[in-house]
């Protein structure tokens, strides 16, 4: 074996929030918009979404304790997740913008439908929708981990999901075999 020549590494202090956030951002994720309904609907862009279990069907989302969405999630029994399609960067940026209007007005810039089970807005054109009942909450430092039991799930398999990595929205690269004759 020969020695590996690698670019210089950057040692990161895990107590430095800015540096640690960059390390976390090196992990590519999908992009979702988490929503709640009720008298004051709310949406929030989130990449901290994970499938947990098939039986029972569970997912988790992590929300900062200082976020308005945190207050809404702790007050309601249900939430929804829209897994964004690769072309929905505008929606992702909108629901990450802290200066967007409150309540239902924040949904004026996107097409959406009302979730029948959760009463939460579902972003039209998404790759998938999941409506969830809050199953359990866990402390996670400056975040709360919301475990949701999936009530309904809908997917559009012809759509391609959006990626987020290195602080940027990205798309999947075409498959190397795509377009080749069999």
Curated annotation (Swiss-Prot):
FAD binds at residues 47-48, 62-64, 98. InterPro entries: Flavin_Rdtase-like_dom, NADH-dep_flavin_reductase, Split_barrel_FMN-bd. Keywords: Antibiotic biosynthesis, FAD, Flavoprotein, NAD, Nucleotide-binding, Oxidoreductase. Pathway: Antibiotic biosynthesis. It holds the Pfam family Flavin_Reduct. One of its GO terms (molecular function) is riboflavin reductase (NADPH) activity. One of its GO terms (biological process) is antibiotic biosynthetic process. Its EC number is 1.5.1.37. NAD(+) binds at residues 16, 143. It catalyses: FADH2 + NAD(+) = FAD + NADH + 2 H(+). SMART domains: Flavin_Reduct. The SgcE6-SgcC hydroxylation activity decreases in the presence of excess FAD. Gene3D superfamilies: Electron Transport, Fmn-binding Protein, Chain A. SgcE6 provides the FADH(2) required by both the halogenase SgcC3 and the monooxygenase SgcC through free diffusion. Accepts only NADH and FAD as substrates. Homodimer. Belongs to the non-flavoprotein flavin reductase family. This is NADH-dependent FAD reductase. It comes from Streptomyces globisporus.
